[in-house]
Structures are given as structure tokens and as C-alpha cells.
Amino acid sequence: MTTLAVITTFPPNRWQAYAKRMLESHVKFWPNNVKLYAYYEGTQPDLVHEKIQYINIEKVNPELVKFKNRRKNDPVANGEVQEIPGGVRRDPKAGKNDRGKGSYLWDAVRFSHKTFAVDHALKTINVDYVLWL
């Protein structure tokens, strides 16, 4: 039988906006043999169910914390266009509608949690497929 795990991340300030509803939806609609691995930061959410496993992303990924600390003051790594000495560079030809403008789409620090969560899941969860939601 093919096995599947679902993973997701969310910041603490998005719990009420969408994360809680997403986890409740998983519990209600997904098959019992599909576990959701919810990578969180800060305080672990209090929604408890056998189909949900919480993972503190900063605890299991010290490299994520180092990356965020290293790039937190780098405008380009945070989706802006102003470059600083020793910082990340963005190809001026990159992008289409946001070429030469700041955009959340280029925010490597904000979205780094997702990359580190996928990496951790692929290395530690013993299933055939890992699905990102």
C-alpha cells in the first residue's frame, strides 16, 4: 500500500486566520491513515488529534534559525530591491510584473520555513510521498 504524509507550516499570527481551520479540515476530511505534520514556531497549538503531529520547526532545524538571523537585515532576502554590501543580489531581469519592485514573492526569509520543513520531512518521515499544503 502506498503511504502519504501531508506537511504544512504557519506562523503563530496566522493560527486564527487560517491555520486552525486548515488543521480541522484535515481531521474532518482526510483519510485516517494520512497524518498531517504541522511545523510551527513559538507555542504549540492546542488542537490535538491523532491525525496531527506538531513539529517545532526551529528546534528541529537550527540551520533555519541561523539563516533567518543571517538574513534578517538584508532587504533583498526580505523581498525588497535595495542591496547592501555582502547581501543577496537579485537579477534585475528577474520577475515579470514585479521587476524592479519589492514583493513578498521574493521574500526568502519569510518563505524559508517551507523549504526547511520539506527538507526535514523528506529526511525523517517514512512514507512513499510527502505532500505540501
Regions found by a protein language model. Give the residues of each.
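N-terminal anchoring/stem segment of glycosyltransferases
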Residues: 1-102, 109, 113, 123-126
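GT-A fold catalytic core of metal-dependent nucleotide-sugar glycosyltransferases
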Residues: 115-133
